[in-house]
Curated annotation (Swiss-Prot):
Name of the protein in question: Glutaminase
GO MF terms, alphabetically ordered: glutaminase activity
Pfam families named in the record: Glutaminase
InterPro entries: Beta-lactam/transpept-like, Glutaminase
Gene that encodes it: glsA
Family label: Belongs to the glutaminase family.
Length: 315
């Protein structure tokens, strides 16, 4: 992975990418199955980078909060691994699904064990793990405080309207939870696990805040500003591996091919990207492609990675 000698050009690269994205008209379609997300202006675009030497660089609408949705699953996985360790992998797999993120088909064939922690079923199991010994409100608070701690920003909130919108329309997620409960892979009532799930998906963050929160994954598990160890270096690598192979649902292979870094997307249009040893990246453009990933966000990260010669596959 290239070192930071190229990073002085990073602010220029971000500005160039943001300017190019502003000119594009093929922006994808905003998610409408969660009604609150359908109200977001598709013309928005923001991008941020936080380097391991402490610089915070932004362009476009990088300080406007958006619903991080499935990007939150990176942080809930981190918390759950801290709570139960590798026992977590007895209840959720580590393989790409090859199916839509809310598919119920594989659960039937695989006895209620979700393929990975980033598809909806897997994230519901992670929420169930975080419920152990807690009321839903306590588990939700723990997740929010953890993300605030990582970002060093206690202004990050949960958008209650988005959470309510998800609960009111989340019939497929209720089906997934009940199906896993029937296999014994939920230890709490489905509605409790789903309450945690809907609320952590409704966390609102800006690109700047999100890139700050992801710093530890780019720095061997440590907060580069304080040296505080969030996770071990090995666990940071493994979370990064999950992001690379499963972070974009059934578009994960294409993202790895085109961009070449670990990333996690959300249907709110955000993507968290990790350049190990260099920087944490966040991009937001609400319009989605056919796989439910940010269309311009993916294009922007591909362009940025090419400009900066970033890839985990580079010598």
């Amino acid at each position: 992975m290239p070192e930071l000698e190229r990073a002085p050009k990073l602010d220029q690269a971000l500005a160039e990418v943001a300017a190019e994205m502003a000119e594009r008209t093929d922006r994808g379609d905003v998610a409408t199955y969660i009604p609150q997300l359908g109200k977001v202006d598709p013309r928005k675009f923001g991008i941020a980078a936080v380097t391991n030497d402490g610089r915070v660089l932004v362009a476009g609408d990088a300080d406007q909060a958006f619903s991080i949705q499935s990007i939150s699953k990176v942080f809930t996985l981190t918390l759950a691994l801290g709570n139960v360790g590798d026992a977590l992998w007895q209840r959720v797999g580590r393989e790409p699904s090859g199916n839509p993120f809310n598919s119920i088909v594989q659960l039937e064939h695989e006895n209620g064990i979700p393929r990975n922690p980033f598809i909806n079923a897997g994230a519901i199991v992670i929420s169930d793990i975080l419920l152990a010994g807690h009321q839903p409100r306590e588990a939700i608070g723990e997740i929010l405080r953890f993300i605030q701690f990582l970002a060093d920003d206690d202004t990050i909130i949960i958008d209650r309207e988005v959470a309510a919108s998800e609960r009111a329309t989340g019939y497929r997620n209720f089906a997934l939870a009940n199906y896993m409960k029937s296999f014994g892979n939920l230890h709490h009532a489905p509605e409790l696990a789903l309450g945690v799930y809907f609320h952590h998906c409704a966390i609102a963050m800006s690109c700047r805040q999100l890139a700050m929160a992801g710093r530890f994954l780019a720095n061997g598990g440590k907060n580069p500003a304080t040296g505080h160890s969030v996770v071990s270096a090995e666990r940071a690598r493994r979370i990064g591996a999950m992001m690379l192979t499963c972070g974009h649902y059934d578009g994960s292979g294409d993202f790895a091919f085109r961009v070449g870094i670990p990333g996690k997307s959300g249907v709110g249009g955000g993507i968290l990207g990790i350049v190990p040893g260099v920087a944490s990246l966040a991009v937001w453009s609400p319009g989605l492609n056919a796989n439910g990933n940010s269309k311009l966000g993916s294009i922007a990260l591909e362009k940025l990675a090419r400009m900066m010669n970033w890839s985990i596959f580079a010598p």
